[in-house]
Amino acid sequence: MTAEGASLESSSCELCTPAAVLCENALAYARPDNHSLSPGHVIVVPKRHVADFFEMTDAEQAAVLELLREVRRSIGSRHSPDGYNIGVNVGEAAGQSRMHVHLHLIPRYLGDVPDPKGGVRCVLAGKPRR
């Protein structure tokens, strides 16, 4: 699945040997999340093994965003969600457990949680607001 300018470098990295690819471009691919939080939950991954979102090239970031838009259209027609969360964890303190950057596109549905206000702020539930 490599393309010019892209490389799947690390044989020990699960995200460097993808399965169930939904769509791809020269620099990134999208696939279902293995630990789906809701119907249609997808991750978008650069093909180059890079740990940090901020270490991705401008071209890789653009390729990832292009696929986010593409899979959003597909999720919308297939699952009809009421909203979305987009997330990326950078560093262990932020919850990154796989050191190959990937963005989550998580479809949200009315009633999937009792009170969705705050969105991803729920990650830091109980922390005082500044």
Could you describe each region identified by the protein language model?
Residues M1-R130:
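HIT superfamily nucleotide-processing domains
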